[in-house]
Regions:
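Extended, charged amphipathic alpha-helical segments
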Residues: 204-391
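C-terminal helix-loop subdomains that flank or include functional centers
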Residues: 303-341, 345, 349-507
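Flexible coil/linker segments and helix-coil junctions enriched in charged and small residues
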Residues: 32-36, 75, 163-182, 292-315
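Alpha-helix initiation and N-capping motif
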Residues: 4, 71-75, 87-91, 254-257, ...
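Conserved aromatic-histidine-acidic binding/catalytic patches
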Residues: 13-16, 29, 45, 58-62, ...
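Extended, helix-rich architectural segments
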Residues: 1-151, 163-166, 301, 379, ...
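Extended, regular secondary-structure scaffolds
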Residues: 99, 104-251
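Short amphipathic alpha-helical segments
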Residues: 74, 81-90, 97, 256, ...
Length: 507
C-alpha cells in the first residue's frame, strides 16, 4: 500500500488515513487476502478465519439480492450497467470490501462508453466528507505493472462549492498547467498525475500521462460541473472502528474478533502438533539403521526384505510422516548384534479434548464477529437452549441487516453517479424517472417452514388474509392471489355440496 504521507505531500493536505489506520489496513490485507496469522508468528498455523468470515458474510448479505432501476429509458440504461456490478462474479469484490473495511464503486468514461471500477481500501485515500457522510474529496490509484516497473496514475477529485475552496497547492498546479480556475460552481476538479516506480508500494518519480498508452488521452486537469459530491458508490462497514474510533474509515468485519481468532489459531496449532507428535515410530539404536559397515544405502529390495519398508523410511535424517518410521537413538544400550532392540512409539491421541476446546474457541469467534453458532463451529458438539439459538440467529440477522443497509446506500450512490455520467456520455438517454427497488433475502433468522407455520396460524386467527399468504409465499400480486383464493373456496363449496348429496343418497 502506498504511504498516505506521499499522497498528502502531493495534494498539500492531510487525508483521512492515519498511520494507525494504514497499519491496520495492511494487517487486514495480510490476514484476509494473504492468509497470514494475525499474531504474526510464523510458527502459528492459521484456519484462515478472517477470509472465511468475510466470504460468509458477503454471501449472506448478497444472497438473493435484486436491485433494479425502472421507469424510463434513462432508468433502463442505468439498470443495464448496474446489473454488471451485481453478477455473482462481481459480488466477490464485496468480500474484499468487508475484509478491508470499505470500498468504492467509481464510474469512469472511456471514449463513448462508461465503465465501473472498484477500489478497495488500499487503492484510494479519502480526504473529506460532507455533513451527511458523502465523500467530497479523495485520491484514487490505478496501477499497471509491466516488466519490472509499476506505473501509478493518481486521480485526485475535489468538490468545489466556491473559488475559495481551492487550496494553495491546487492553485499552483493550475499555474503549472497554464489553466484558469473554474467559473461554474459547484463542480469537481479532477487532477490526473502519473508516476513510475520499481515497487508497487511507492509512487516513484513523476512522469507525463503519455508514458502509458492507456492514459495518453486523459486530461491532466478537468472540471465536472453540477455535482456536490463525488460520483461514486461508497461502502463502509457499519461496525465500530476499534483501531481508531475517531476515524471516518471502516474496520474489517473480523476485527472485533481479533483476539478470539488468534486463540483459535493457537489451539489449531496445538491440535496439529498433537497429530504430528503422535505419529507412529520405532525407536532403535542407530547402528541397526546402518545398512552396512561402510554406511552405504540399502537397496529397495534389501530394505523391504529386512525391514518391510522402503529405504527412505529408515533414513533417520528425514523426520516426516512415513519417512520418520524409524528413530535412531545414539545411546549405549548394551544390546548385542544378535539381539535387536526396538521400541514402538504409538501414544494415545488426545485430539478429542483439543477438538472440543477448538470448537469453543470458534464459538467465541462467532460471538464477537456477529455470527450465529454453527457458521464456523460444530453446533452438534455443544448443547444450547432454545433461547441461545434464537439469540445467536438474531445476532447474525442484525449483522447482515446492517451490512445490507450499508451496501444499499452505496449502490444508491452508484446509481446517482451513473445518472450523472449519463448526461456526459454520447447516445445515453435523456433525463427520466428512476424507480429504484431493492430486494434482500430475509430468511436468515427464520427458516421457510417455520415462517409458513407462523403465517398459517395468523391466518387461522384472522390476523392475516389468505390472499396475503399467497402474495408473500407464492409471489403473486393481489389480484391473482384473490382470484386463486376465490377459486379454491368455490371448489371447496362444490365438494361440500357433492358430499352432502352422496351422504343423503346413502341414507
Amino acid at each position: 500500500m502506498i504511504n498516505h504521507a506521499d499522497i498528502e505531500n502531493i495534494i498539500g493536505c492531510k487525508t483521512l488515513v492515519t498511520d494507525r489506520m494504514q497499519r491496520a489496513i495492511e494487517d487486514w490485507y495480510d490476514a484476509a487476502i494473504n492468509g497470514l496469522p494475525l499474531d504474526k508468528n510464523p510458527e502459528t498455523l492459521t484456519l484462515d478465519l478472517p477470509a472465511l468470515i468475510c466470504a460468509e458474510l458477503a454471501r449472506l448479505t448478497t444472497l438473493e439480492l435484486e436491485a433494479t432501476v425502472e421507469g424510463s429509458d434513462r432508468a433502463d440504461w442505468i439498470n443495464t450497467r448496474l446489473q454488471r456490478v451485481l453478477t455473482p462474479r462481481k459480488r466477490r469484490i464485496f468480500t474484499v470490501a468487508l475484509a478491508l473495511g470499505s470500498g468504492i464503486w467509481k464510474p469512469y468514461q472511456s471514449g463513448n462508453k462508461l465503465g465501473i471500477s472498484f477500489a478497495n481500501a488500499t487503492r484510494y485515500f479519502p480526504v473529506a466528507h460532507d455533513v451527511e457522510g458523502s465523500l467530497t474529496e479523495g485520491v484514487f490509484i490505478d496501477t499497471i505493472q509491466e516488466d519490472d516497473s509499476y506505473y501509478h496514475r493518481l486521480e485526485w477529485m475535489h468538490v468545489l462549492e466556491r473559488r475559495q475552496d481551492l487550496r494553495d497547492a491546487e492553485l499552483a498546479q493550475l499555474e503549472d498547467y497554464d489553466l484558469a480556475a473554474p467559473t461554474q460552481f459547484p463542480c469537481i476538479k479532477v487532477v490526473n498525475l502519473a508516476f513510475r516506480s520499481a515497487t508497487q508500494d511507492s509512487l516513484g518519480s513523476p512522469e507525463d500521462l503519455s508514458i502509458r498508452p492507456e492514459w495518453d488521452e486523459i486530461e491532466p486537469v478537468a472540471y465536472l460541473t453540477g455535482q456536490e459530491t463525488l460520483p461514486v458508490g461508497y461502502f463502509v462497514t457499519p461496525i465500530v472502528n476499534s483501531v481508531d474510533p475517531d476515524s471516518e474509515l471502516g474496520a474489517a468485519v473480523f476485527e472485533p474478533a481479533r483476539r478470539q481468532i488468534i486463540d483459535a489459531d493457537e489451539q489449531y496449532t496445538r491440535l496439529d502438533w498433537e497429530y504430528e507428535g503422535g505419529e507412529l515410530a520405532v525407536d532403535t539404536d542407530e547402528k541397526f539403521l546402518k545398512p552396512s559397515a561402510t554406511g552405504q544405502q540399502l537397496s529397495k529390495a534389501q530394505a523391504l526384505k529386512e525391514y518391510g519398508v522402503p529405504p527412505e523410511a529408515i533414513d533417520h535424517t528425514a523426520p516426516h510422516h512415513r519417512e520418520r518410521l524409524f528413530h535412531g537413538i545414539n545411546v549405549n544400550t548394551g544390546i548385542t548384534d544378535s539381539t535387536p532392540f526396538y521400541q514402538v512409539f504409538s501414544p494415545a491421541l488426545r485430539d478429542g479434548s483439543y477438538l472440543t476446546g477448538l470448537n469453543q474457541y470458534l464459538r467465541n469467534v462467532e460471538s464477537h464477529a456477529g455470527l450465529s453458532f454453527g457458521v464456523i463451529s460444530q453446533v452438534a458438539d455443544v448443547e444450547k437452549t432454545a433461547t441461545e439459538i434464537v439469540n445467536s440467529k438474531q445476532k447474525l440477522y442484525a449483522t447482515v441487516s446492517d451490512l445490507q443497509a450499508a451496501l444499499e446506500d452505496a449502490l444508491r450512490g452508484l446509481i446517482n453517479a451513473l445518472d450523472y455520467w449519463a448526461d456526459h456520455i454520447p447516445g445515453a438517454p435523456g433525463k427520466g424517472k428512476l424507480n429504484i427497488a431493492f430486494k434482500w433475502d430475509d430468511s436468515i433468522i427464520l427458516d421457510r417452514l417455520t415462517e409458513m407455520a407462523q403465517w398459517q396460524q395468523e391466518v387461522s386467527m384472522g390476523l392475516r388474509s389468505k390472499a396475503e399468504y399467497r402474495m408473500h409465499f407464492f409471489g403473486e400480486d393481489e389480484e391473482t392471489a384473490t382470484q386463486a383464493v376465490q377459486a379454491i373456496q368455490q371448489e371447496a363449496g362444490a365438494a361440500d355440496i357433492l358430499k352432502g348429496v352422496l351422504d343423503n343418497g346413502d341414507g
